[in-house]
Amino acid sequence: MARNHITPELALDALSPVAAFRNGASFTDKTSKGVTSPAWAWNKSTLNPKNRINSLSPSHHPTWRLDGCTSLGTQFYTAPTFFSPVRPLHIHTFIPTPSQWPLGLRSLLGIDSAFLYRDSRINNFHIAQYVLRTLEHWSSTIHDFQSMYEALPFGSRIVFENIENDITKIRIRIVRTHDLERQLMSITSWPSRLTKCPSAILPPTLDISRLHLVQQLHDSTAIVELRRPRTEADIFRKTGTDIVVFKTLSDSPSYLYYELSILLTMPPHPNIIPAPLHIITKKVRFGSKLAIVGFTLPCLSRDSLRDILPRRRIQGSLHLHDQIKWALQVTSALKHIRDKGPGWYCDLRLDNVLLSDSDDVVLIDFEQRGVLPSFAPPEIRYLDCIVALVKDSSLDCGVKEEYKKLYEEHIGPIIDEKIMAEYHGNIPWLCQSRSKREALQVYMLGRLLWCIFEGVSAPQVEIWMEYLYEPEVEFPVFKLTPMELRPLIESCTQGWTQSDNEVKRKGRCLVGTTDGKKYELGVALDAFTKIWKEELERGKMFLKQKTDCQMHNGTVGSAHLDTPSLDKVLETLVNFGKLL
């Protein structure tokens, strides 16, 4: 492992505000675990023939497949292929964090590069074949594996307890998530969630056994094939296909049910994903409850703007009339959500903006979890930091008390986690007024408009993941955006601050922002610690300014009261479109 390469541990720690309160020594100890002399001894070395992994080449007749990963390379979307059909039971494979591995295996399996990739590109690394070969051996030792697998509770986990050169020595256990199934809502109690909109039409229900897993796209989203009797009415006649998207829970069921209620009660809009086609149920073992585990949506064949924008720009097929059309459609969708939907949408990012077959925008994902820091408004970023620090158990009591006070001042009383689970959405957004939420959405829209007109995948290169097309220019630099639209984007993104980031990722390496010099891990951590300390101080000043503004004006404080409304953004885009 090169000392100037990004690692999962560094990415995890450096992207958390907790890094502001950690020292380099403790971090180095953490990432160097297992790097002591025994790991280099001949009897442990991977150069020793007896320690070599039997094979890391793809199997000629694979019995498992891997569709992607998440959680910095510790959670894999795996599925057996030696029986069919496979139901989308959300059973994923989990491995230990790399800090618990023998050092030689970290390098051999390529985890310090592989963790940057979340899609099928993970299969280009040895860790993918290692996981697949291990699952193949493990499943072959279990009698009637199919029956055992299909009887598992929804969302169960296949857990590797250790990582060894010899895959037969890996201890694997199954975590049966009975507690998760107990949290699921029954189909009979679901209508009570729609009392505020009694006219909502419920889609038909289908048992999960009718779905055949085709591909796991993300933690909570899969492409599935609907298996139905020939006599059933063909509700897919319009699309001529039985392929649909299965949306399920990734952790807390509350987010899933909140999204489902929004999609069922919000009036349709041409640029918002339509209401679910089915509600998917599963009979759970305890109490014989028929529980809601997800819903199906139409499957859009096109990619998201995250990949389409840079691809078309590179190919020379990204045209201004398409860009302005997409910008108008996204803004129109946000207005619809404001006026006829839940009132706000905090998940606005490029991978949640898909294209239909007609090349029109379709907005997806209404869990209301929030977005990456690169799209989040400054105020939300700062409040997210406060929430994270209050929840972290490793911090000094004095530090936690300081941020508990900030939490209570700017968010509200600290509520027990179990009670908070009943609230749906991102906590910092929940404490905002209606007008403030619109201003925050306009900020995110401004960042997204910049990406659309610059033809890039994101506002910046991320430390913890690599896009299929890495951004070649970073916000707020303008190169391709029409001059007439630049003032609009600047007014939308008021409050953006240039962080004095000393380090960034270039490929696998950490380099200095100004000189391009490669950083070793200890130096990089010191830089991230400094960055986070400065970010937290900026946050305190920002929130104080907001409070002072509120006290003097008697209104909800805002550092930027002249942020344009969604109506104004739409008007500006329409007027520009008339000039084309």
Predicted segment positions?
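Helical subdomain adjoining the active site within ATP-dependent kinase catalytic cores
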Residues: 2-187, 390-580
